[in-house]
Amino acid sequence: MKLLLILLGALLAVLTIKRTSAVQGSNHLICYYDGTSYTREGLAKLTLNDLEPALQFCTHLVYGHAAINPSSNKLVSNNEKLDLDVGTGLYRTITGMKKKYPHLKVLLSVGGDKDEVDADNNKYLTLLESSNARIPFINSAHSMVKTYGFDGLELGWQFPKNKPKKVHGSIGKLWKGFKKIFTGDFIVDEKAEEHKEEFTALVRELKNALRPDGYILGLAVLPNVNSSLFYDVPAIVNNLDYVNLMAYDFQTPQRNPEMADFPAPIYELNERNPESNVNYQVQYWLQNHCPASKINVGIPSYGRAWKMTTDSGLTGLPPVSDADGPAAGGLQTQTEGLLSWPEVCAKLPNPANQHLKGADSPLRKVGDPTKRFGNYAYRSTDDKGENGIWVSYEDPDTAANKAAYVKTKGLGGVALVDLSFDDFRGACTGDKYPILRAIKFKFQ
């Protein structure tokens, strides 16, 4: 009997190691798939046939995004007609991809800035505040993962975000310091310390529920969420299989409508917020005892675009002042201020647009020979003060630079957000998923 128990224990350990082995070591390539891209119109629609060529490169596929029901505190589909068996059934179809790609680990994401939240009554905070509320969330999460064949769950917990910070010169910094004496600092969350402790409890309790089945538990630190406020790093890392640092969207036309600037630099720029870069975020987690092998750097597959005005000048050199909020969105993104990589690529100089004028004329591309901050492209306003645009974006080269940074630092890998904004049709150069391929090539 004793021998039998030992053998059963050894078998359980092997199964657990097998399921979690994809998050140990390095060169993780965690790919995000936004299920809503399946519902887009025309060429913007990412079908499962379009998705499949990417899966050979991904170590993980994160399907997003599930939501929290504020009444029951249960994990639920954000679109039942799309996700569940009563409709299109993408949950089961996506996890079924593992039969053809057995190396692939498929996880379900909750939150991820895709779940509707009342700013005055944030359900993600309310759930944390009660152990009785956490229980139905944990039970329903475990059930959903098991029912639909996912390999685990990723927490894209929607904590309150930092207040946007403006770029200040020397005089501006003096005035800001003087004003702060009287107004004080902006408080992101008055109960941040309590919520940090409660989130630690949630991670521990959730991992305890998932561990017997060997399920993976990941964390996505969403853009502009202050890690020092909400994450007790030493207390949670042992219960997490990986941490995706979404170190991008530091500057966006929604957060900073009057100032266009690099959204996702690797390193700090002069006279900018020292925290608004990849390296700062990585170093914070490393210094707080998160193993390097668990850290994955988030890389977006899109650009952020502002309208330039006559007062924005002619050079395009960031930060660009006197911007006028978000530029028009693309046919693919359908979101103001957001352009997918193929949408950006089509605006850069090419034979098809070299003779076009006005809003269709090509942008001027400015590369980054330092490999520290990123590319941008712009078109100053015309004589009528119209058609000005400034966009900073990720392309295969900048993504490869970040992958090289990850290798140099000995980190776990990269999280690409998301596949539907990479050039999945090969419209730009003929190569499908060029950003994904560039990252994978750098890891080889």
UniProtKB/Swiss-Prot annotation:
GO terms for cellular component: extracellular region. Gene3D superfamilies: 3.10.50.10, Glycosidases. Glycans are attached at residue 226. It is found in: Secreted. Disulfide bonds join 31-58, 345-428. GO terms for molecular function: chitin binding; chitinase activity. InterPro entries: Chitinase_II/V-like_cat, Chitinase_insertion_sf, Glyco_hydro18_cat, Glycoside_hydrolase_SF, Glycosyl_Hydrlase_18, IDGF. GO terms for biological process: carbohydrate metabolic process; chitin catabolic process. SUPFAM superfamilies: (Trans)glycosidases, Chitinase insertion domain. Lacks the typical Glu active site in position 158 that is replaced by a Gln residue, preventing the hydrolase activity. Its precise function remains unclear. PANTHER family: CHITINASE, CHITINASE-LIKE PROTEIN IDGF1-RELATED. Cooperates with insulin-like peptides to stimulate the proliferation, polarization and motility of imaginal disk cells. May act by stabilizing the binding of insulin-like peptides to its receptor through a simultaneous interaction with both molecules to form a multiprotein signaling complex. Belongs to the glycosyl hydrolase 18 family. IDGF subfamily. This is Chitinase-like protein Idgf4. It comes from Glossina morsitans morsitans (Savannah tsetse fly). The gene is Idgf4.
